[in-house]
């Protein structure tokens, strides 16, 4: 196959011609020191809820440049990295909020049919880190997975309006997930060889 300019198109999964289009699913589960296989994370019990507005991954490095007065010698090094994964969670409940707030506690009284979420009180900080795992499914061009370990650092706003759904905009700041200092784990589904 060729494009309009007569160039040969490379067919297959996740090539340089692949257009990534669409949203995906967001999974959140407690981090216990290592990131498990995708099948362990991608369970219904770990689904944060359905999302609105997709997901956004941001990587922001900081650099330091040393330069002589005459501009003849120059060296630039990376001094710091920051990574964030942002998403809007549209379907949620108290269990979702507990994963978004370090001071959140959830109790359920099944006899009364009430789930209670308590938020606040610095002494209630659970100091937990979570695996935040976004999956963009594409059966033709291949799936893309983005995984970070971190905490929601944006807090949340619950806006209850008569003509708009309530969406929690979460912003997870990534922390190193291994001994190499990995902040972002991005996996692409590619063609398999025999």
Predicted regions and their residues:
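Short acidic, glycine-rich loop/turn motifs
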Residues: 30, 134-141, 174-176
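Oligomerization/assembly interface segments of phage tail-like spikes and tubes
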Residues: 74-97, 163-177
């Amino acid at each position: 196959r060729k494009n309009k300019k007569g160039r040969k198109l490379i067919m297959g999964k996740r090539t340089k011609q692949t257009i990534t289009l669409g949203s995906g699913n967001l999974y959140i589960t407690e981090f216990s020191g290592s990131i498990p296989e995708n099948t362990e994370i991608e369970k219904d019990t770990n689904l944060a809820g359905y999302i609105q507005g997709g997901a956004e991954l941001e990587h922001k490095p900081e650099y330091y440049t040393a330069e002589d007065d005459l501009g003849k010698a120059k060296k630039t090094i990376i001094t710091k990295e920051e990574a964030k994964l942002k998403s809007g969670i549209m379907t949620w409940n108290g269990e979702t909020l507990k994963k978004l707030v370090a001071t959140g506690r959830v109790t359920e009284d099944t006899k009364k049919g009430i789930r209670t979420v308590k938020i606040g009180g610095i002494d209630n900080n659970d100091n937990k880190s979570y695996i935040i795992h976004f999956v963009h499914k594409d059966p033709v061009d291949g799936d893309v997975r983005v995984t970070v370990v971190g905490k929601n650092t944006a807090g949340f706003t619950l806006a209850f309006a008569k003509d708009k759904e309530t969406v929690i905009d979460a912003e997870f700041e990534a922390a190193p997930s291994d001994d190499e200092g990995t902040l972002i784990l991005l996996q692409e589904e590619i063609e398999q060889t025999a």
